[in-house]
């Protein structure tokens, strides 16, 4: 950090969308000297409208605007990971990886270089200081809460981040944009899904992989009996029911994917239930608040399945998660995030 650092300065990640636009307004209202930065992570067909929107907003607010091209890094660390995980028969979580290992670390790095203490985004999350550590907590809008994706942030980031959107609903954010005359931002549609893969991921894999990388294979039941042909194992995920292309007059789900044999195992829903799992690449904000406790909630999908659990550290440096009730469709590669009430305690990647 340069000696010129100032606690009233903030570097704001700006996508040109509604959330980061209102975040800039709110930070200015709070007395911060804002600098906007737009990361060039991925551009579909050279679409740079988001850059122009962010630049125009900064010009209107009379704040500096920077762009930072990280497309090569994003390709190597996020997109290639996404493709490789599906080719390994896993279910990837690119937004978790991007936030914890790319976006927020980049904000810190550039802030340090510029002598700016704070950095911020338009994420719908909050922050709280508990027992000597900062923690991410859920945003007040349950439909927009993004805390699930931020379990891996270290203290050096948590202690300097600003989160102006955490106490607002999306409806109120749109109202603020309209009230302040930022009508384009107020009416922008929310981005859905993975930023670089807005279409079905299967189409994306076909586009990105060499011809012949994905070949037809076979569905089997749990007893090893052949059921039908499938289009290629990367096109299926654990727990999937729709889109299998078969009619057995009963509900069947993907239970297991065997990449080496291009096999997909199908079963009934009950067979997908598990009462334990292991995590790698984990991060815990404060081990004293998480390990060996019986009041921890684990979530394995964004805004979906949650259950009480007990978490223990294993000799091989993995986390063992004992579920108090079964969960279905626990898939390798997915993220698991730990909570107590609204506080994020950590998380990891399911093995």
Swiss-Prot record:
One of its GO terms (cellular component) is cytoplasm. SUPFAM superfamilies: Adenine nucleotide alpha hydrolases-like (SSF52402). Residues 144-146, 301-302 are annotated as: Interaction with tRNA. The record marks 123, 334 as: Interaction with tRNA. The keyword Nucleotide-binding applies. GO terms for molecular function: ATP binding; tRNA binding; tRNA-uridine 2-sulfurtransferase activity. Belongs to the MnmA/TRMU family. Catalyzes the 2-thiolation of uridine at the wobble position (U34) of tRNA, leading to the formation of s(2)U34. This is tRNA-specific 2-thiouridylase MnmA 2. The lineage of its organism: Bacteria, Pseudomonadati, Bacteroidota, Bacteroidia, Bacteroidales.
């Amino acid at each position: 950090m340069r000696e010129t650092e100032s606690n009233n300065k903030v570097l704001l990640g700006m996508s040109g969308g509604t959330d980061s636009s209102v975040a800039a307004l709110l930070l200015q209202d709070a007395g911060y000297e804002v600098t906007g930065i737009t990361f060039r992570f991925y551009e579909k067909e050279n679409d740079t409208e988001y850059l122009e929107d962010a630049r125009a907003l900064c010009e209107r607010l009379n704040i500096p605007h920077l762009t930072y091209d990280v497309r090569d890094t994003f390709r190597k660390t996020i997109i290639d990971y996404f493709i490789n995980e599906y080719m390994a028969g896993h279910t990837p979580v690119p937004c978790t990886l991007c936030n914890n290992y790319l976006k927020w670390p980049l904000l810190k790095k550039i802030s340090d270089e510029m002598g700016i203490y704070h950095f911020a985004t338009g994420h719908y999350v909050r922050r709280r200081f508990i027992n000597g550590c900062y923690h991410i907590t859920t945003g007040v809008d349950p439909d927009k809460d993004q805390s699930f994706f931020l379990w891996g942030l270290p203290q050096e980031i948590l202690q300097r981040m600003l989160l102006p959107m955490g106490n607002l609903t999306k409806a109120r954010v749109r109202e603020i944009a309209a009230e302040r005359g930022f009508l384009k931002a107020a009416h922008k549609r929310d981005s859905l899904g993975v930023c670089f893969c807005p279409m079905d991921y299967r189409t994306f894999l076909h586009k990105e992989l060499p011809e012949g990388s994905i070949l037809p294979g076979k569905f089997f039941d749990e007893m090893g009996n052949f059921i039908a042909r499938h289009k290629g194992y990367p096109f299926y995920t654990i727990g999937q029911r729709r889109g299998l292309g078969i009619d057995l007059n009963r509900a069947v789900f993907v239970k297991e994917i065997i990449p080496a044999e291009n096999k997909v195992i199908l079963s009934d829903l009950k067979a997908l239930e598990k009462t334990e799992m292991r995590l790698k690449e984990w991060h815990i904000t404060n081990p004293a608040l998480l390990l060996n406790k019986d009041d921890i909630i684990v979530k394995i999908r964004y805004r979906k399945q949650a259950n009480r659990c007990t978490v223990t550290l294993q000799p091989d440096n993995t986390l063992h998660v004992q579920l108090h009730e079964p969960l279905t469709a626990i898939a390798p590669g997915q993220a698991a995030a730990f909570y107590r009430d609204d506080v994020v305690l950590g998380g990891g990647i399911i093995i």
